[in-house]
Amino acid sequence: MLDHPESTKEALVQWIRDYFSQNGPSCSAVVGISGGKDSTIVAALCKEALGAERVVGVLMPNGIQSDIDDAKAVVAHLGIPHIIVNIGAAYDALTNAIIQGEGYKTVTGRTDISKDAGINTPPRLRMTTLYAVGQNLPNGARVANTCNGSEDYVGYSTKYGDSAGDFSPLANLVVEEVRQIGRLLDIPKYLVDKTPSDGLSGLSDEDKLGFTYAVLDRYIRTGEIENPETKERIDYLNRINKHKLELMPSFHP
């Protein structure tokens, strides 16, 4: 874990300042606010780097979000401008249009949306929403990616959904390191220690992954792990999900 979290936090804030000075000196940072630790910490870092007036939080429930009050508490505590966009109607309209599409049943053999499509479509709609909001801001915007290094390592994200963005402050920090940074920021501590979940299944991230972030973090940082089955699963997830972090392959004639 971080030996000097204070200096890492200061370096992160400066990194965000430097990114914007080179890639949009007057732009705002647009951050999707879920009410979890990662988006809260990214928003707080952006506020410290750019000032509250240049950070726009976007809350994007899909219909009813059980922890929407946490997301509202984040933007209220940070004092940043925010927009609430309920993507429920867009999700319903898109999935219905797909199901009713000419040839859908013939080609897919289905009359509904698959579980994977149901899980991954909302994050992609949210990323579309963030870019649309950004392009409506007076001075433009850059969209924050809020994934952390532990999630990235095992591919616990949606390609072109929450894995997208313009800049990624937490990509090289594992979960416990992110929490170390969070404890140094002016944010509610219960959000820093909040159990990560997808907000869909009622299960925590760790329940779905089959191992704890503590085990994963240690393995990423030291290569040490006790359970060979857990090591095999982590290695497998890392291998099959590498494409999410790589540029699209292209043919060179």
Predicted regions and their residues:
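Conserved G/P- and acidic residue-centered "switch" motifs that form tight phosphate/ATP-binding loops
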Residues: 36
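Short, surface-exposed alpha-helical segments at coil->helix boundaries
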Residues: 39, 43, 68-72
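Extended, folded domain segments that form the structural surfaces/walls around functional sites
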Residues: 39, 60-61
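ATP/NTP-dependent adenylation/nucleotidyl-transfer catalytic domains that generate, transfer
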Residues: 1-31, 45-48, 53-56, 62-63, ...
